[in-house]
Amino acid sequence: MDKSKRLFTKSKRSFRRRLPPIQSGDRIDYRNMSLISRFISEQGKILSRRVNRLTLKQQRLITIAIKQARILSSLPFLNNEKQFERSESTTKTTGLRTRNK
């Protein structure tokens, strides 16, 4: 092959199938916190189906389980750890008063 044709050939990489995030033995339940916490972002949002690589039925069951866990307060609605860190760092003391900036 000459150089002009060699530029357009694709390299053949091996395709490795990813493992499904939910195994067949896993029960999707609001009490299974180790399973549910894998599908929640750092901000406490439910991750999309495309990010999770779940089927439609699995995503629906995960969403229902997360909402049940939030209502029963075993899972927070929001994850406010970053907001607390930011508010503590912006507090300034001026004389006897403390001000939040």
UniProtKB/Swiss-Prot annotation:
Localization per record: Plastid, Chloroplast
Keyword ATP-binding carried by entry: no
Main location: plastid
Matches recorded under Pfam families: Ribosomal_S18 (PF01084)
Any one GO molecular-function label of the UniProt entry: structural constituent of ribosome
Domain of life: Eukaryota
Cellular compartments per GO CC: chloroplast; mitochondrial small ribosomal subunit
Keyword annotations of the record: Chloroplast, Plastid, Ribonucleoprotein, Ribosomal protein, RNA-binding, rRNA-binding
PROSITE patterns noted in UniProt: RIBOSOMAL_S18
Keyword ATP-binding: no
BP term (GO), one: translation
Sequence similarity: Belongs to the bacterial ribosomal protein bS18 family.
Self-association state and partner proteins as the record states: Part of the 30S ribosomal subunit.
PANTHER family membership: 30S RIBOSOMAL PROTEIN S18 (PTHR13479), SMALL RIBOSOMAL SUBUNIT PROTEIN BS18M (PTHR13479:SF40)
Name of the protein this chain belongs to: Small ribosomal subunit protein bS18c
